[in-house]
């Protein structure tokens, strides 16, 4: 019987299934960070339980760490407590951790794949909604709650119910200047933030297969923003080439054995999906979100939508509220929207490919950040990404143009550290969420690709990067 990739991954990890469909699922890898793990570790201590499989866990601090000078530690007492608590818990339980001073430290969804800790065929969980990122490797990956983090630490299993299968098929060739970020924003714009609810979402088609692993991670990262439980891409040579030789990846004979299995991790010909969504890559344009939800997105060629043209009263009210919060008027050209700050980073777009794309735009335009842009910052996803970018001279390109070159961390993706928007400030951001207050109380977020963000920083407003050549 032909199986989908999701079916294969699920079936390979079922320990037991109850009559109501509740399944005990084996977990191969748990990633931990400082925000959702303290209560889980405390629960283990109170119950006097050990970590069941220490080697299956990998930890890093990312949400609360400063991205400026770290020589004086963390100034904010709450952030410091969370980071110190993770350090102490990992030391106590013997869990491998990349501490703040380790060059391997970075955003959890960047360092996992970077280290080869995320592998095809795995079940991967983390107390973070964007764990779907790891599905790019032909893995079943999704976020879990704090009580579930404790459950996995104690048992290496998770209670779950199976999702339905969805295929998002993107065929054709992307126009020059368009990226994986534009693909996934276009998908969310098409199906909405509830379009994937109840589904595990597989991304396929020639445009997806043409993406690098960095691009595939960007797409899977935002599957959760379409409402899906997980996002995934089948394994191919691009997957294997990325993994080979990484620290946690198998070596020698074990590598050959693993590859033999990994090559089966794709949906079979004729596999049945409960729902299929199709897009043509050549129809995708550089995307810019205008509202307070990732589904509120249009292309750089468009104008801010007019609520009066929306027949659904619920959607119309949501649009009106979003426009009020974003301080935008209907029918304004997207290219006329001026910005105050630029953030290039996050678990969506902080890998070396993203750094290169942004630096290329900066070089192409050959100017400094616009006078109306108060701050433009580039935050690499890990210390290793930062090192690689510096070897290539990308940091010099950014700094010469007036960008700040920062230390790795979640940074301005969310207002949980020193990097945030002030009320009323408008930001071109390569992150994944544009909710009210996401980047700071009263802050206004526009989601874009790294290239679009870099161009906006230099021009002071959104521009069409396709016109750069």
UniProtKB/Swiss-Prot annotation:
It is an enzyme of class 4 (lyase). [4Fe-4S] cluster binds at residues 347, 410, 413. Keywords: 4Fe-4S, Amino-acid biosynthesis, Branched-chain amino acid biosynthesis, Iron, Iron-sulfur, Leucine biosynthesis, Lyase, Metal-binding. Binds 1 [4Fe-4S] cluster per subunit. Its EC number is 4.2.1.33. SUPFAM superfamilies: Aconitase iron-sulfur domain (SSF53732). It catalyses: (2R,3S)-3-isopropylmalate = (2S)-2-isopropylmalate. One of its GO terms (biological process) is L-leucine biosynthetic process. Belongs to the aconitase/IPM isomerase family. LeuC type 1 subfamily. Catalyzes the isomerization between 2-isopropylmalate and 3-isopropylmalate, via the formation of 2-isopropylmaleate. This is 3-isopropylmalate dehydratase large subunit. The gene is leuC.
